[in-house]
């Protein structure tokens, strides 16, 4: 199961209880998604199974994420030996783009500010995931260069271009066409001049 659309029965900052086809689900979430009770919601799911052989126990936990990219980062994080699901959830309480930038740039100082992450874990995360995310951050920086060149060719001032670069949101996990980015930037610049 990749995602689930369900009716929210209960929600707080850590857990959502939902119902789908008369089956109840308790789903752990990284942050408060401000879900409304009795409304429908879509979460991307990951089922984590832990086995305790000395107690003959199999524990299943369901984790839910608002975006598919959060789910992918969670899976990448728990693939690291010393990072379990609780630590991965703590990491995902922060902005996903900031976390990805920190991993790609090996910003250990930022990562150790996260609860549950020590120097050793931060080094492991960067060493094992850096190669995966560095290209995404470089792509994001390339978009800014292309946007700047495109707006300059259209006759916008340097001040407008700098403003547009700070306002246009480019998701580092998603492929976006440069023409879409330029049109978003033009809208931002237009709104600025209207005010």
From Swiss-Prot:
Short name of one Pfam family? HHH_5
Keyword annotations: Cytoplasm, DNA damage, DNA recombination, DNA repair, DNA-binding
Statement: the UniProt record of this protein carries the keyword Lipid biosynthesis: no
Cellular component annotations (GO), alphabetically ordered: cytoplasm; Holliday junction helicase complex; Holliday junction resolvase complex
Q: Name one GO biological process term.
A: DNA recombination
Could you confirm whether the keyword Transport appears in this record? Answer: no
- Taxonomically, which superkingdom? Bacteria
Could you tell me which SUPFAM superfamilies the record lists for this protein?
Answer: RuvA domain 2-like (SSF47781)
The annotated region (Domain II) lies at 67-141
Q: Where is this region: Domain I?
A: 1-66
Q: What is its subcellular localisation?
A: Cytoplasm
- Which molecular function term from Gene Ontology is one that the record holds? four-way junction DNA binding
Comment field on protein domains: Has three domains with a flexible linker between the domains II and III and assumes an 'L' shape. Domain III is highly mobile and contacts RuvB.
Family that this chain belongs to: Belongs to the RuvA family.
Q: What is the stated purpose of this protein?
A: The RuvA-RuvB-RuvC complex processes Holliday junction (HJ) DNA during genetic recombination and DNA repair, while the RuvA-RuvB complex plays an important role in the rescue of blocked DNA replication forks via replication fork reversal (RFR). RuvA specifically binds to HJ cruciform DNA, conferring on it an open structure. The RuvB hexamer acts as an ATP-dependent pump, pulling dsDNA into and through the RuvAB complex. HJ branch migration allows RuvC to scan DNA until it finds its consensus sequence, where it cleaves and resolves the cruciform DNA.
Name used for this protein in its record? Holliday junction branch migration complex subunit RuvA
């Amino acid at each position: 199961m990749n995602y689930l659309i369900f009716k929210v029965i209960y929600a707080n900052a850590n857990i959502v209880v939902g119902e789908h086809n008369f089956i109840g689900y308790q789903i752990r979430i990284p942050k408060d998604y401000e879900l409304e009770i009795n409304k429908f919601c879509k979460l991307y799911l990951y089922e984590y199974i832990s086995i305790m052989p000395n107690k003959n126990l199999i524990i299943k936990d369901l984790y839910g994420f608002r975006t598919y990219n959060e789910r992918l980062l969670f899976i990448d994080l728990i693939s690291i030996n010393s990072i379990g699901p609780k630590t991965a959830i703590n990491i995902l309480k922060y902005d996903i783009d900031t976390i990805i930038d920190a991993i790609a740039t090996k910003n250990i100082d930022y990562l150790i500010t996260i609860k549950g992450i020590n120097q050793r874990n931060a080094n492991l995360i960067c060493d094992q995931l850096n190669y995966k995310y560095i290209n995404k951050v470089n792509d994001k920086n390339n978009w800014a260069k292309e946007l700047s060149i495109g707006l300059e060719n259209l006759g916008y001032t340097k001040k407008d271009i700098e403003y547009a670069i700070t306002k246009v949101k480019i998701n580092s996990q998603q492929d976006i066409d440069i023409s879409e980015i330029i049109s978003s930037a033009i809208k931002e610049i237009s709104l600025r001049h209207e005010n």
